[in-house]
Swiss-Prot record:
Region of interest (Disordered), ranges: 175-194
Natural source organism: Shewanella sp. (strain MR-4)
Lineage, broadest ranks: Bacteria, Pseudomonadati, Pseudomonadota, Gammaproteobacteria, Alteromonadales
Position of the signal peptide: none
Skewed-composition ranges (Polar residues): 175-193
InterPro entries membership: DUF480, WH-like_DNA-bd_sf, WH_DNA-bd_sf
Name used for this protein in its record: UPF0502 protein Shewmr4_1554
Pfam name, any one: DUF480
Top-rank taxon: Bacteria
Coiled coil: none
Family: Belongs to the UPF0502 family.
């Protein structure tokens, strides 16, 4: 399953609204366009026309990832996803897994901590460990749907990406780039961490000492 940026946004919005506003689901083209273009909880922020959203829907329909619904005399066609948890879907996911995949589709790669903070309307994770456990399950499927990205410089947590729109080739390229010598020496940083921490401590002590002397000088002049 390979999704374009626009297709991923449409699927992410349908997954989100199914949980957060079930009374308004399925979504009309207008409602779906508004959801795709939200200024909050979206990365990147898009400005899609209804025509572009319709193009994405037509493509998803050919892939059998959405279905159209109209009824009760209304001429307005509404759309629902067939991305997961349908009778014939290959993807049968827990609500926790749906929440994680939904957030990654809507906001791109994120850390477990970010996923837990942002998932409160989709699923109630009790802690980050539960998020990490769910991520692990999604990565260990016969067909993995998530991948771990190389840790960014200065960050403590790794980010994770979905593999529906973030292709495996892109993930592997990012990993190779991060592991190359020109990308920065993460291993060297790890080896020198103690020395750097000791140096920082020493500098902090020197700054504190200078501050004490400055305070004493100011006091003597006043």
């Amino acid at each position: 399953m390979e999704l374009t940026l626009h297709e991923a946004r449409v699927i992410g919005c349908l997954l989100e609204k199914e949980v957060t506003t079930p009374e308004q689901y399925p979504l009309s083209l207008n409602a779906l366009t508004l959801a795709c273009n939200q200024k909050t909880s979206r990365d990147p922020v898009l400005d899609l026309s209804e025509a572009l959203v319709q193009d994405a829907l037509d493509s998803l329909n050919k892939k059998r990832l959405i279905s159209e619904q109209s009824g009760f005399g209304s001429r307005v066609v509404k759309y629902k996803h067939r991305f997961c948890n349908t009778e014939f879907s290959e993807l049968q996911l827990s609500s926790a897994a749906v929440a994680i995949i939904c957030l990654l589709l809507l906001r791109g790669p994120q850390t477990p901590g970010e996923l837990r903070t942002r998932s409160n309307r989709l699923h109630d994770f009790k802690d980050v460990l539960e998020v990490e456990a769910c991520i692990k399950q999604l990565m260990e499927r016969d067909k993995p749907v998530l991948a771990q990205l190389p840790r960014e410089p200065g960050k403590r947590e790794c980010r994770y990406a979905e593999l529906f729109s973030q292709g495996a080739e892109q993930i592997n390229a990012a990993s190779l780039s991060a592991d190359s010598p020109s990308a920065g020496s993460n291993s060297l940083n790890a080896q020198d961490r103690q020395q750097l921490e000791a140096r920082v401590t020493q500098l902090e002590e020197q700054v504190a000492e200078l501050k004490d002397k400055l305070d004493s000088l100011i006091a003597s002049l006043s």
